[in-house]
Amino acid sequence: MADERVSASGGMETSFGFREVGTGEKQPLVNDVFHKVAKRYDIMNDVMSAGLHRVWKDAMIAALNPPGREDYRVLDVAGGTGDIAFRIVERSGRKAQATVLDINGSMLSVGAERARKKGIEANLEFVEANAEDLPFAANSFDAYTIAFGIRNVPRIEVALREAYRVLKRGGRLLVLEFSEVEMPLLDRFYDAWSFNAIPKFGKLITGDDAPYQYLVESIRKFPNQRDFAAMIRDAGFARVSFTNYTGGIAALHSGWKI
């Protein structure tokens, strides 16, 4: 299930929240959202997940279990503020090397400053680039991670193929993303929280509810767990699986390049 579609006029369209936009229009719109929330991104994730994103991210890093080797290289995509990369570096005993890639310079600036304050900048590289066109040679990384970012990519299938290309043989893909709630009653509560509470909290915290409204809508437009797993397989990955967190509010997807 690709996110890209042919419009009635023959052009390629994708979703920006509940709006249909041209494929080329989505990235600037997404960039504007994250320029607005960059300095409060972690607070935004707390609002979006009621703080559970921290538990989910820790579970993601536990699943990756990065070894304490200096030649272990991870590419963390859409990871501008460094939240995942920092966890990887610390879990490896400050041995692993993490490249943080984001298309948004504001997010990367926040991440680079945080890395300096933590004293781990030697283990990190910050790269401003597009997930659909990675500036790296094939077979460069041992792992590719992306947390709460893949749904913002205009052409998800292209980004997945790029992930496959830059991974080494035996490399692992891990995608953490909001997903489809699979627990009865929880889905109703989550819908009420998402559409009523999250934009209001967002406006209270940042003065602007529009970025939060988009993010809530983008979750609903993202493929469900099984459809997204099929997209990962279509990109060439093997041993594809997913694990639901908190009844399916989020899911961790895994695939291997073998």
From Swiss-Prot:
Signal peptide: none annotated. S-adenosyl-L-methionine binds at residues 81, 102, 130-131. SUPFAM superfamilies: S-adenosyl-L-methionine-dependent methyltransferases. It catalyses: a 2-demethylmenaquinol + S-adenosyl-L-methionine = a menaquinol + S-adenosyl-L-homocysteine + H(+); a 2-methoxy-6-(all-trans-polyprenyl)benzene-1,4-diol + S-adenosyl-L-methionine = a 5-methoxy-2-methyl-3-(all-trans-polyprenyl)benzene-1,4-diol + S-adenosyl-L-homocysteine + H(+). Keywords: Menaquinone biosynthesis, Methyltransferase, S-adenosyl-L-methionine, Transferase, Ubiquinone biosynthesis. CDD domains: AdoMet_MTases. One of its GO terms (biological process) is methylation. NCBIfam families: MenG_MenH_UbiE (TIGR01934), PRK00216.1-3 (NF001242), PRK00216.1-5 (NF001244). Belongs to the class I-like SAM-binding methyltransferase superfamily. MenG/UbiE family. This is Ubiquinone/menaquinone biosynthesis C-methyltransferase UbiE. The lineage of its organism: Bacteria, Pseudomonadati, Pseudomonadota, Alphaproteobacteria, Hyphomicrobiales. The gene is ubiE.
